[in-house]
Amino acid sequence: MTHEGKEPVDLRVIRELWGVICERADCPDENSYTSRLLQDVKGIDKVLEKVGEESTEFILAVKNGVPERTTEEAADLFFHVLVALRAADVDLSGVIRELERRRK
C-alpha cells in the first residue's frame, strides 16, 4: 500500500500483531503485558480504560503538533483497540470487511 509521495506500507505487521494478541489470549503468559491486560480482574473494563488513556494521549499529541509523539501514540492506541476487539470476541477480519464495505 502506498500513498502519493510516501514509502510503501507493509501491513503484514497488523496480521502478525493480531496473531500474537490472540495467542496471548488463548495461551496466557505471565510475562506478557498483553496476557496480563486480558487477564486483569477488572476484565474488559481494564482494556477499555487503556483505550481511553491512549485515545487521550493520541489527541494531545495531534493537538500539540508533535509528529513523532503522534506516531507513538497512534501505535499505542491501535494496539489497545486490537486488544479490546479480542477481549470483546470480535474478529479483526470483520472490522476489515466493514472498512472495505465503507470504502465502496
Curated annotation (Swiss-Prot):
Protein encoded by which gene: hisE
Stored Gene3D superfamilies: MazG-like
Molecular functions per Gene Ontology: ATP binding; phosphoribosyl-ATP diphosphatase activity
Keyword terms of this UniProt record: Amino-acid biosynthesis, ATP-binding, Cytoplasm, Histidine biosynthesis, Hydrolase, Nucleotide-binding
Enzyme class: hydrolase
Domain of life where this protein originates: Archaea
Protein name (database record): Phosphoribosyl-ATP pyrophosphatase
The protein's Enzyme Commission number: 3.6.1.31
Pathway, per record: Amino-acid biosynthesis; L-histidine biosynthesis; L-histidine from 5-phospho-alpha-D-ribose 1-diphosphate: step 2/9
GO biological process per UniProt: L-histidine biosynthetic process
GO cellular component terms, A-Z: cytoplasm
InterPro entries cross-referenced by the UniProt entry: HisE, PRib-ATP_PPHydrolase-like
Family statement: Belongs to the PRA-PH family.
Lineage: Archaea, Methanobacteriati, Methanobacteriota, Stenosarchaea group, Methanomicrobia
Swiss-Prot/TrEMBL catalytic activity: 1-(5-phospho-beta-D-ribosyl)-ATP + H2O = 1-(5-phospho-beta-D-ribosyl)-5'-AMP + diphosphate + H(+)
Subcellular location: Cytoplasm
